[in-house]
């Protein structure tokens, strides 16, 4: 054995590594303690820079030590000559780059570099752009570096066209680049500002067509990559609806005025103010939500004094002015009438299709044909299927209703993990279609039975509905937003899976509630119905609570004003 090199056993190697780690830890802790002691004593000199360099060079994410470094550099700024300071800054930039090589996603390092360059009289921004390009070449999804690049581009006033060309180069190299696609969505509206395009920034048609060609190349190259599909969704546009008062309703019986808005707002929050004019005279009122909660809502209402509802006059005019939205609506309550209202005769574009809004329907039609072509090649691509559905919704939701439902079935089979989400999205679209049909027919009755609904949306659109049929669906609860249905008189929800009635509250006109064959377990779940003053008929047949002993007596005690309770 003599003359041969001894080979360490695995146990010896592990022990040696343990001792090495312990030694490094002792040095690390000693250096850290020394830095803190010097900082506490106010000894902010170059020795602190040296000590923190040793620690941060190994662990760039020690935020407190970056703070110490900044304190030292601020101290040295007033002590050093310009030449010495330039040498110090050059060394600091080099040290920061070495830290980024250790951890390219170090928050503290990137922040410190921003801080340092912001204090320089003439920073070399071209060098910083080159540094970003180098690090993005290593990892094009490093969002820390992308944030820093946007900072540098803003400070250096880099033209958006140059930055767009930079994203071109990265996307050409690798289509799967979320950050590059996102940066394009920020740059294009700057390059091509459109009047009245809103905060989302709509693009001119020629630019849009060019971008659509680019993104089509991406998802035809790799149909399963999500980044291009998300950018495609942005290109189609998501315009915000215009601020508007959708509906104004006055009830003489309830001595109440109700307003429906195009978006949720918080009245009395300083920004959102409602002014009520009755017969051209301002009336001070207290605004509240139907649920009585102080939070943003589509629906706001107020109580009216008896003088504003005097039936001796031929009519009363009510006008609500929304100051933040610069919108108003007026309705008339005629003598002898119990209610009056005014609502928008909204088209589908105004109500729902603003979510996908491209000026030219030919562009949408072309996109739909391209996606269908891709779907033939990739029949199980979920992104393609979802995009086809959204394009059909954008083009004509009623014309494509049947075809859309077929695509939903295919999509659920392809992507069963998101079946619940797809069921809810399908329910949302079906409810939108039903609301559109009701609007066109100008009726106050809405039939949503046998549609396999799993969720209720857009209830703020149903302020004037008097009869609502939700029978034979898959609803598990009636949502609090149901309180928006201030005119509702009859609610049918047979044959669902309803377990809770928390949403059936404060419905001033509700007279009949049909809940046969649901999953109501205990009489206590009916407590919310005590807030519905006109409820006279309640049908609970086929619910588990009907099997409990003494349930009829308990229900009669809980709801004494309900004259007919069927169990």
UniProtKB/Swiss-Prot annotation:
Enzyme Commission number, as recorded: 2.5.1.60
LRR repeat positions: 442-463, 464-486, 487-508, 509-530, 534-555
Reactions mediated catalytically: geranylgeranyl diphosphate + L-cysteinyl-[protein] = S-geranylgeranyl-L-cysteinyl-[protein] + diphosphate
Class of this enzyme: transferase
PFTA repeats: 44-78, 88-122, 124-158, 159-193, 207-241, 363-397
PROSITE patterns per record: PFTA (PS51147)
A GO cellular component entry from the record: cytoplasm
Record carries keyword Transferase: yes
Phosphoserine: residues bearing it: 98
Pfam families assigned: LRR_9 (PF14580), PPTA (PF01239), RabGGT_insert (PF07711)
A single GO molecular function term of this UniProt record: zinc ion binding
Any single biological process term in GO: protein geranylgeranylation
InterPro entries: LRR_dom_sf (IPR032675), Prenyl_trans_a (IPR002088), RabGGT_asu_insert-dom_sf (IPR036254), RabGGT_asu_insert-domain (IPR009087)
Keywords for the protein's UniProt record, in alphabetical order: Leucine-rich repeat, Phosphoprotein, Prenyltransferase, Repeat, Transferase
Known regulation of activity: The enzymatic reaction requires the aid of a Rab escort protein (also called component A), such as CHM.
Assembly: Heterotrimer composed of RABGGTA, RABGGTB and CHM; within this trimer, RABGGTA and RABGGTB form the catalytic component B, while CHM (component A) mediates peptide substrate binding. The Rab GGTase dimer (RGGT) interacts with CHM (component A) prior to Rab protein binding; the association is stabilized by geranylgeranyl pyrophosphate (GGpp). The CHM:RGGT:Rab complex is destabilized by GGpp. Interacts with non-phosphorylated form of RAB8A; phosphorylation of RAB8A at 'Thr-72' disrupts this interaction.
Entry's family note: Belongs to the protein prenyltransferase subunit alpha family.
Function: Catalyzes the transfer of a geranylgeranyl moiety from geranylgeranyl diphosphate to both cysteines of Rab proteins with the C-terminal sequence -XXCC, -XCXC and -CCXX, such as RAB1A, RAB3A, RAB5A and RAB7A.
Protein name per its UniProtKB record: Geranylgeranyl transferase type-2 subunit alpha
Organism: Bos taurus
Lineage: Eukaryota, Metazoa, Chordata, Craniata, Vertebrata
